[in-house]
Amino acid sequence: MFSTFVPFLIMFREGLEAALIVSLIASYLKRTQRGQWMGAVWVGVVVAAVLCLAIGIFINETTGEFPQKQQELFEGIIAVVAVCILTYMVFWMRKVSKSVKVHLEGAIDNALNSGRGQGWALVAMVFFAVAREGLESVFFLLAAFQQDVGIGAPIGAILGLVCAILVGMAIYWGGVKLHLAKFFKWTSLFILFVAAGLAAGAIRAFHEAGLWNHFQDIAFDLTDVLSTHSLLGTFLEGMFGYQEAPTVSEVSVYFIYLIPALILFFLPPRSTAGSAIAAARKINP
């Protein structure tokens, strides 16, 4: 159950971001009497989704044939990539959430005013916008699946994606009003704790791969207080990568990541032209 929730939340959030992008594009095309271009939008969405799925399956199937130490190394690398992507996702959304709509509409206008290849330009714009959300999800899910071999994580991911699509459709048709600013703020805070757990897990994987053997003394042992076999321990392990007897290096990495991330997260956001440039680059690279 607990191993299901984190993949569910990540896929729901990422899927909702992608759904909102498609919804904004569809609404703008409809509002500007250019609904005939919706076919190009769906081509971009489908191609991006298929590519992300293929990349995820390929990486997951390929690594299963690695020797044990190479698998641990790859698991650590994937965890590091997932931490970087999740962190970028949190702070990018915090920085440009208020200006995405304006720059997305500008990117659509640029694509459709690009001459004879305007249809392909729109396909490319949608493809890159959706593919980036998809690749963020792929690397996080690879890290999650490697930490939990059960069926809970895939089920959570699928349910999260389905819910995101349904909510995105409801928002587009006007049936649901979601306070997106609060939603992304609190899910972002949760994701930072998840990323800290992944960072600690990466160090553990690198140790098992034989690459990191420093500070391997047990920092503390809570086996008798909060075992991972207890209900709360299982919850914390599934959510945040909790370990009942972590090493000094795991605890250090956890807080070295989490403390600066939380400080930056709670600092007042700066409203600058840089935010607009960042948004434009993400939507229309």
UniProtKB/Swiss-Prot annotation:
InterPro entries: EfeU/FTR1-like, FTR1/Fip1/EfeU. GO terms for cellular component: high-affinity iron permease complex. Keywords: Cell inner membrane, Cell membrane, Ion transport, Iron, Iron transport, Membrane, Transmembrane, Transmembrane helix, Transport. It holds the Pfam family FTR1. It is found in: Cell inner membrane. The keyword Transmembrane helix applies. The chain crosses the membrane at residues 5-25, 39-59, 73-93, 122-142, 151-171, 183-203, 248-268. Coiled coil: none annotated. GO terms for molecular function: ferrous iron transmembrane transporter activity. It comes from the Bacteria. It is a multi-pass membrane protein. Part of a ferrous iron transporter composed of EfeU, EfeO and EfeB. Uptake of Fe(2+) ions across the membrane. Belongs to the oxidase-dependent Fe transporter (OFeT) (TC 9.A.10.1) family. This is Ferrous iron permease EfeU. It comes from Yersinia pseudotuberculosis serotype I (strain IP32953). The lineage of its organism: Bacteria, Pseudomonadati, Pseudomonadota, Gammaproteobacteria, Enterobacterales. The gene is efeU.
